[in-house]
């Protein structure tokens, strides 16, 4: 012992000579009482051999390695004093006591769960009482029982036949923290609802007797086993919540009772943080739910007194800040916190709400119309049945009430399978809509608090927004998925019911004689019948309309093909520059296509010489120009002066109009001169000709051909007969006549893509320029 006493008297500097010195001292400290020295006379020689078994040497080397960890080297290099050893001993004793308490309380808790399942949950579930919701009362208590059993088995495995110095409890909680949080989250989330359901059950005598019977049997078992008396069903249901809140307390106390050199110290710290986070997450989930329930309360349930009590300086100030922040966002004066997931789900939510509402409205209207049309349909069917049979043939007519039975079944099944689910789904949308609006209010509060420093008010706004946003994102996804499923199922059911109704109707009238299909087309047959009708005396005056329109349509007018104009070359431009003055030269601002007879095509930048600033009809919008290779008419809006000096003298306002509005296609009225104003000064002959047919009723051959006018289809039009012309939206058409053969100006004779026919005049529009 002389070297140890000498080492105790040395200073701190002399104690840290080298690593060999420390190892020799630790070696002496780790010697056990059963170790024997070969030569007891050798006191100062530390290199003496020891007489030890191989197992003792292995255990000794493990302990020595633990002592030589960096913690041991950095904490203190001096030999532990007896007081330190006593302190470590007391901590280890307290640690062992806490571990025993942890395992025993977990075992008692698991026993309580087993008794609850055996004596309460299973008997109530086996009775199958209609008004008693066992799942609503106890939620996922079976999962809570399973996770508790798993935790207990892991704790027993970590402590059984393991020395106290080697027991690691923290790793057990780190291993099970994931499922532990998920299961207790569900139970704690539904506990408040379960408590409310329990209170409602206790108000009904029959349900209260069933609960009291199960609770009494459980109390008897508690008395037999000497456990604390069970107060009521609520104290049994709250046990899982109390248990999960006790885990952080036990682990914190266990960590404080564990020496820093113990291998479980670091794991206990991580386990304590993990179970603490579990409780924080459970409380946050509970707070989110309370926040949703707070804002989900309907305003109709609030009295006038409650509404007035909310009106104060703080509420007025908060709302004014929201309005100000909203205006800043609209004017892009302030950035906004965005959540793309929420925006996507909100858009889908609003689309689903609109679709469901329209489906309910349209399907209800469809059922009503079918109901109104059913009597007439049955009557028409009976009459067709009579017509299809010749005299003397058997005509079995079924009763009216029996014939209407398929529709009654269709209406009843539609109400049950389609309208009822859709109406129930539609009633669920107002709640989320109100929460979405409240979420936007909290977002405005959060945005307004961002520029300011962290305060209690800003932290509260942030937490409320994040809680409400997270709750909406999570539940909107589930709601939208369920709503889409219900909507698609209802639409498929509606289509199936309509198909079944048509099949029943077809089978009901399958005995009606089938009419052979005509060899000629149906349009030709109809035309022949109409010709026979027009030969009658009392319709003979109006017969010219149909026949003349048919003859006019059958006349084929050869399509006019505009000749291809050669493009301008450098020689052509040189010719123009040498022949004409600078004030007569213009350039094409953009490509111009020929739209009328005697028009020419121009490419952007081509040089032209203006010969005359009007057309033969006197219109100044079309100029007669020379490109050096061809002469023709071009709209003046496509030209700009070639002389740069002249272009600079143009007024600023005129430049603004030319540059900013030259690419806009402005549609003007498509009416001819007979309604408002003439198309041009020279088109009065067209108006006169149309008016002459109205007043004099002359023959169709007296119509005068007018120049082709280029118009565009403002709306798409689908032809209903062979005499009409189908048009696509924005399709260019040639107008051949501005009225039909009877003088009706509502229908024009048009030509498009080699096809001719009549189109409604109000479907056409003319551009200000080509």
Curated annotation (Swiss-Prot):
Coiled-coil region: none
PROSITE patterns, alphabetized: BAR, DH_2, SH3
GO cellular component terms listed in the entry, alphabetical order: cytoplasm
Domain DH, chain residue ranges per copy: 94-285
Superkingdom: Eukaryota
GO molecular function: guanyl-nucleotide exchange factor activity
Keywords recorded for this protein, A-Z: Coiled coil, Guanine-nucleotide releasing factor, Phosphoprotein, Repeat, SH3 domain
SH3 domain: residues covered: 581-644, 706-769
Compositional bias annotation for Low complexity: 37-47
Phosphothreonine: residues bearing it: 34
Function noted in UniProt: May act as a guanine-nucleotide releasing factor.
Protein name: Rho guanine nucleotide exchange factor 38
Biological source species: Mus musculus
């Amino acid at each position: 012992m002389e070297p140890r006493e000498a080492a105790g008297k040395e200073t701190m500097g002399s104690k840290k000579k080298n690593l060999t010195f420390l190892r020799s001292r630790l070696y002496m400290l780790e010697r056990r009482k059963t170790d024997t020295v070969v030569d007891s006379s050798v006191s100062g020689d530390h290199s003496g051999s020891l007489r030890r078994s191989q197992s003792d040497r292995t255990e000794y080397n493990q302990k020595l390695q633990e002592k030589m960890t960096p913690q041991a080297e950095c904490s203190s290099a001096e030999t532990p004093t007896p007081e330190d050893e006593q302190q470590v001993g007391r901590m280890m004793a307290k640690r062992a006591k806490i571990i025993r308490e942890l395992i025993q309380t977990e075992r008692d808790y698991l026993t309580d769960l087993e008794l609850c399942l055996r004596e309460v949950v299973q008997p109530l579930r086996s009775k199958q009482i209609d008004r008693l919701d066992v799942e609503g009362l106890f939620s996922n208590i079976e999962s809570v029982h399973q996770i508790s059993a798993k935790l207990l088995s892991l704790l027993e495995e970590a402590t059984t036949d393991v020395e106290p110095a080697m027991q690691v409890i923290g790793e057990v909680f780190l291993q099970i923290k994931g499922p532990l949080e998920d299961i207790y989250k569900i139970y704690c989330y539904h506990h408040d609802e379960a408590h409310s359901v329990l209170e409602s059950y206790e108000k009904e005598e029959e349900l209260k007797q069933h609960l009291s019977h199960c609770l009494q049997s459980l109390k008897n078992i508690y008395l037999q086993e000497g456990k604390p008396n069970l107060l009521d069903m609520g104290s049994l249901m709250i046990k899982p919540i109390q248990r999960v809140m006790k885990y952080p307390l036990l682990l914190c106390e266990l960590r404080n009772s564990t020496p820093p050199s113990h291998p479980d110290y670091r794991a206990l710290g991580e386990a304590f943080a993990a179970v603490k986070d579990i409780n924080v997450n459970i409380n946050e989930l509970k707070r989110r739910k309370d926040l949703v329930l707070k804002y989900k309360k309907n305003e109709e349930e609030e009295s006038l007194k409650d509404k007035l009590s909310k009106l104060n300086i703080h509420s007025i100030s908060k709302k004014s800040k929201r309005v100000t922040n909203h205006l800043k966002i609209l004017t892009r004066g302030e950035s906004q916190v965005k959540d793309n997931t929420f925006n996507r789900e909100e858009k889908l939510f609003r689309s689903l709400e609109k679709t469901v509402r329209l489906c309910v409205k349209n399907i209800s209207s469809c059922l009503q119309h079918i109901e109104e049309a059913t009597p007439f349909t049955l009557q028409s069917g009976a009459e067709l049945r009579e017509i299809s049979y010749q005299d003397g043939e058997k005509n079995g007519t079924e009763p009216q009430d029996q014939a209407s039975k398929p529709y009654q079944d269709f209406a009843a099944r539609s109400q049950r399978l389609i309208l009822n689910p859709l109406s129930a789904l539609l009633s669920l949308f107002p709640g989320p809509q109100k929460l979405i609006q409240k979420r936007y209010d909290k977002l405005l509060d959060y945005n307004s608090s961002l520029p300011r420093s962290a305060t209690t008010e800003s932290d509260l706004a942030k937490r409320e927004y994040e809680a409400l946003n997270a709750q909406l994102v999570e539940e909107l996804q589930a709601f939208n998925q369920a709503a889409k499923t219900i909507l698609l199922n209802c639409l498929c059911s509606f289509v199936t019911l309509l198909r079944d109704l048509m099949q029943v109707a077809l089978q009901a009238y399958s005995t009606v004689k089938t009419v052979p299909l005509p060899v000629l087309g149906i349009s030709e047959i109809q035309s022949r019948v109409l010709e026979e009708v027009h030969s009658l005396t009392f319709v003979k005056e109006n017969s010219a309309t149909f026949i003349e329109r048919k003859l006019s349509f059958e006349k084929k007018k050869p399509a006019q093909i505009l000749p291809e104009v050669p493009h301008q070359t450098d020689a052509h431009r040189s010719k123009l520059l040498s022949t004409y003055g600078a004030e007569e030269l213009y350039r094409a601002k953009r490509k111009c296509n020929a739209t009328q007879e005697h028009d020419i095509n121009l490419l952007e930048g081509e040089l032209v010489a203006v010969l005359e600033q009007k057309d033969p009809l006197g219109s100044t919008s079309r100029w007669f120009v020379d490109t050096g290779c061809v002469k023709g008419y071009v709209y003046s809006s496509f030209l700009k002066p070639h002389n740069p000096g002249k272009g600079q003298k143009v007024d600023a306002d005129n430049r603004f109009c030319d540059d900013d509005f030259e690419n806009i296609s402005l549609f003007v009225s498509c009416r001819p001169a007979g309604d408002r104003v003439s198309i041009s000064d020279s088109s009065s002959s067209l108006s006169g000709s149309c008016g002459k047919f109205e007043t004099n009723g002359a023959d169709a051959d007296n119509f005068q051909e007018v120049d082709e006018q280029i118009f565009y289809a403002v709306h798409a039009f689908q032809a209903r007969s062979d005499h009409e012309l189908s048009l696509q939206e924005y399709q260019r058409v040639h107008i051949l006549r501005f009225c039909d053969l009877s003088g009706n100006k509502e229908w024009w004779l048009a030509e498009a893509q080699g096809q001719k026919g009549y189109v409604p005049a109000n479907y056409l529009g003319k551009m200000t320029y080509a």
